[in-house]
Every structure is written in structure tokens, then in C-alpha cells.
Amino acid sequence: MIYNYFSEPSNVLHFLEIFVGISLMISSIQHLKNINCFSNDGLLPWDLFKKNYRPPLISHGTFNQIFERKGMFFMNILRIILLPLFIMGNKELHLLTLFLITLLTIVIYVRSAIMCNAADQVNNIILTALLIHYLISDTPSNPSLIYFYASLLIISYFSSGLLKLHQVKWRNGIYLKQVMITRNYHHPRLIKILRAVNRKKFKYISQVIIFWQVTSFLMPLLPGMIFYFYLFMCLSFHLVTGFLLRLNSFIWTFTALLPCLIYLHEKIFACL
């Protein structure tokens, strides 16, 4: 049933928009909860310009106000207001809300990159590609966009696995154990349990994750049951990682792309 549902491009994109919308909603709520972390001076990382002065445009008062605490507050509030309109799929407002949400998301990301994770980067790519697609494509549910998203997800998995494969401490489980302990400071009992776990278990888990990620490029070519096993690995990885590391938007963003893999898999096997 799921396979048949996601064989339609419109269903895939609608699912993606809902999950990305939820991810952005959670991200904005997290920004509002941590709004006091932003100063009143505008926290754009000026050192990115590799200069000892701020360019005239950036030094302008209006520009700087966008990036200060009040600016961040109102941008996140505006994004929260726009997201339901975007998710509900109102045809008249869809393109306008998508444009505004994309613009807000990129500006918020630039302003608070230190608070962002891989999900925020992927959200930027998803929204930008979706906006370009709706602007230039004659058909709202063009499969080429779904193929792009499926490729994006596979590249994300594969590159992550390849980087881990080249790191000895990832292969032997040391980094995995360190990440699980240091990112769970809010769960003292869990930290105590994790510290007591034998490092060999982390080694095996780490190697399974690396193997799954490195071989992820084969997913669209795998037969039914093996393909669904890989999908289960993907979903489990995002759920467990998101829960343990408190990456709330991470769960929604990457899960949003899984139907794109299902669609790609279905189209490949339909041609065989």
C-alpha cells in the first residue's frame, strides 16, 4: 500500500512538504526558546568576510536590525505563521509562501549557523530546489525533482559513511561512544549506562552504520525485501539519532526524503 501511494509524484512531494514544514516549525520553536542566546548587536559572523571592517551595506542600521535579537524573533514568528499555509497546499498562496519561507530559512541559517545541524542545511537545499522547480517547471509534480531529492539523500548517506570509514576512531567505535555520551548531558542516567557499555559493542554498531551508509548508493537497485530493510535502517537511524542527540528537526527532514527513494526504486524496477 505504501509502495503504491508513493508511486505518484504528487503524493511524494506533498509528504515531503508536510515533513519539511514540521521540521522548520520545530526549528523556529527551538530558536525562540533560545532567543536570549542572540545579542542585540546582530550576530552575523563578520569574520567570514576575512576583513577587519564591515562592508558599508552590512554596517547599515536597517540591515543590522534584521540580524539582531528582535529581528530573529520576528523572522521565526513569521515563519511559524506561514508554514501552515504552505503545508495546507493552498494553490493561490503556495508559491508566495514557499518563496517567503525559503528566504526566511536561508537568512535564519546564515544568522545562526552555529545552532544549526545537517537537517538545516538539507532544508535549505530542499526549499531552494522546490522553489526553482515550481518557477520553471510546467508540471507541478515533475519526477526530475524527486530524482534529485533521492540522489541528495543517497549522497548524504554515502559521503557520511565514507568519512567515517576513513577515521580509525569511527571504525573502532570510540567516536560513536564519545558522541553518545557528550551529547546526552541532559540524561545523567543514560550517560552512566553508556559509560558502562563495552566498547566492542559500540565498535560493532559503528561498523554496521558505516557499512549501511557506504552501500546506500545501491538502495535503488536492491530487490524488495532488502530494499525495505535498508529503508528500515534509514528510519531507525534517524529516530534513534534524533531522540538520543536531541536533533528534533533531523528526524523530520531526512524522513521526508525517504519516499523519494521509494519512488526512484519503483521506477527503476518498472523498467526492468
Tell me what each language-model feature is.
Residues 1-272:
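Alpha-helical membrane-anchoring segments
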